[in-house]
Structures are given as structure tokens and as C-alpha cells.
Amino acid sequence: MSQKRKHDDTPGDASSASKTFKKHRPFKPGQNHQQTKHHRRPNLSHDDENGRSTNALKSRIRDLKRFLTHMDSVEKHKMSAGARQERERELEACEHELAEKLNASREAEYRKKMIGKYHQVRFFDRQKGTRILKRLKKELSALEDDSKKTALQQRIHNAEVDVNYAIYYPLMKPYSSLYPKSKNKKSSDSEEAEDTGEDSKNSAEVDGPKGDVNMWKAIEEAMQDGTLEKLRYSKDAVPAEPPKKSKKPKAKDSKKEKSVSKTSHDASASHNYAVQDQDEDSDGGFFE
């Protein structure tokens, strides 16, 4: 006969014994039991590559200027010539670094503005130029007459320049379209142009320099020299920094004059009311 297991050997008791009970902390009225808020990590994307933002540079420049002016004004707090020269060098370095960062941010903002402004026109010019280039290459492969190949190869070269014109035109410079549409065309004229065949398209295409002619020739030279990327990111067309607006002290003086005149007018009015009240009181006493 099988023996019965003892009560202590049951698995239920072992599992119950292994369970741990959570201890409840006593409630304190002054203690905040809400979850602790996690502090956000600082966003370093607004800072520069070296970690120093423009705001930090501005505050450092302001502190250095205040420190130097304080040392000049207070005789007791004079510093040695070497320490002062070190502070002045630090101030010049901070001002130079701040000017470079401001120029870089201004150029980036201007580049972003110009890219967004002429993105659609450049895209359409590039699409049309690639279509023309593919068609000309197809014609060259099917052409059997050697006498016409030289002229067709020149047209292919011009089409390649057109495509590079749309891609590598300087981003900072206002874009001049290769295939501008006249604003005075009517809708009927556009519908008739769509119905025409390839012969009319070929006759309408302008072969050779177009758009900004000087830039078209510059891109052709850059293709030979291999400097297309340099031409695209050139900074020659970046506008100069606008001059800072000077404060107008005359406006403040006029405001002060208005306030003074207003106070004098109120004072005279109150004086007139007081005189009138005195007259009324004196008249009443006479008739009594």
C-alpha cells in the first residue's frame, strides 16, 4: 500500500511560503506621492558642433565687457596688465566666433529660402532637359548618316549643359529658368501647343545657351574643370547683413512732452474747479 504524503510536503505550502508581501509605506500628509517627473535631456541640436551656442557666447561677451568696465571704473579692483590682456583676447575671440556663427546661420536660412522658392522651376527644367537628352541620344544611336552626327553631338552636349544647369545652378542665386513660359499666353494657345507634333517641339526648342547665359557658360566650363559642386555651393550671391536699426530718442522726448502737457492741463483744470467751488460757497454765504 502506498503511504500518504505528509501535510508539510504539499507543493501549495512551498509556493505560499515563497511569496513575498509588499510593504505599504505609511501615508504622510506633507509628502508628495505623485510620480517623480523626469527631467528632459537638453536638446543639443540647437547648439553648434562644439557645444557653444550663440546665446552662451552673447552672455560671455556681456560678462567680459561688464567686468572690464568695472575694473576701469573702480580703482581698488585694478588687475594686472597680463590678466587684463588675457581677458581682452578672450573677448575678441568670443566676438569673432559669434560673428562667424551668425553669418553661418544667416547663410543657411537664406539657402533654405532660395531652395524652397525655386525648387519647382528647377525640377521642371531638369525633367524637360533629361527628356530632350534621352531623345537626342536615341536619335544619335539610330542615325546612319555620319555627316549629321557632329551637329547632333553638339546638341547632345548642349542638352547635357542644360541638365547640369538645372542641377548645379548656385543655390544662393535667384534662378533663371531655361524654358520660361510667357505670362500673356491664353488657354487656347496652350491647348493648341499640346496638340502639335514633334516637329513643332523641335522647332520651338532653343539650342545653345539659354536662361542666364553667363551662368550657362560658367556651368559649361565647370563641367570641363570638374568644379560643379563648388559652383553650386558658392556664396557670391549671399546678401550683406542689414544694418542695425538705431533707436529714435525723439519719440521718447515727444512722449515726455505729451505727458508733461497732460499733467499741466489736468492741474489747471483742477485749479479752475477749485476756484469755481470757492465762488459758489461764497455766494451761498452772502445770501444767507
UniProtKB/Swiss-Prot annotation:
Coiled coil (UniProt feature): 83-154
Biased composition (Acidic residues): 277-288
Composition-biased stretches (Polar residues): 266-275
GO BP, one annotated term: maturation of SSU-rRNA from tricistronic rRNA transcript (SSU-rRNA, 5.8S rRNA, LSU-rRNA)
UniProtKB keywords: Coiled coil, Nucleus, rRNA processing
Annotated Basic and acidic residues bias: 1-10, 198-210, 251-265
Subcellular location: Nucleus, Nucleolus
Predominant location category: nucleus
Pfam families: Efg1
Keyword Magnesium: no
InterPro entries: Efg1 (IPR019310), EFG1_rRNA-proc (IPR050786)
Stretches for region Disordered: 1-58, 178-288
One CC-aspect GO term: nucleolus
Protein task: Involved in rRNA processing.
Protein family according to the UniProt entry: Belongs to the EFG1 family.
Name recorded for this polypeptide: rRNA-processing protein EFG1
Gene of this entry: EFG1
